[in-house]
Amino acid sequence: MSKETTFADAVVEALNRAKILGVRAGTEHRYTGVWTVVVDGRVFARSWNDKPTGWFRAFRKQPSGTIQAGDLEIPVRAKLVRSARIRDAVTAAFAEKYNTKGSRKWVEGFAEPERVVNTIEFVPG
C-alpha cells in the first residue's frame, strides 16, 4: 500500500480533465463510469444512489480499487467524506465542471442531501 496521501500533480490534472472516469472496487468488479471532481488537489466522486450492488457500496465494503482515465490505471483507496465543508465544496465543483444544460439535472440531483452523503475521496492506494 502506498504511503502517499496525495496524487502527483500530473495525475490530478489528468483526472480533473476527464469528464467520466472508470472506477472499480477490488479486482473482481467491472469498471463503472462516474463523474469526478478535484477540490484543492484532492479527487472526489459522488454516487447517485446507494444500491447494494453499486460501485459506491462496493468501495464501502472494499476500499481498495482502481481508477481508469484514458490509458491510466491508478490504484486507489476510497474514503467516505464526513466534513460538511468538503461536501459543500464538492457540490460546487460538480456545478462548475459539469455546467452544460444536459448536465443540470444531474448536478442538481447531486446537491440533494441523500446524495451528498454518498461522497467519497480517492487517495493513492
Give, region by region, the residue ranges found by the protein language model.
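Short, structured beta-strand-loop surface elements
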Residues: 29, 50-125
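Short secondary-structure boundary/capping segments
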Residues: 12-13, 35, 110-112
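A generic local structural motif
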Residues: 7-10, 30-32, 107-108
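Serine/threonine-rich low-complexity intrinsically disordered regions
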Residues: 6, 40, 100-103
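General secondary-structure edge motif
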Residues: 3, 16-17, 39-40, 70, ...
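Extreme N-terminal tail/first-helix region
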Residues: 1-21
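Short beta-strand segments
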Residues: 17-49, 57
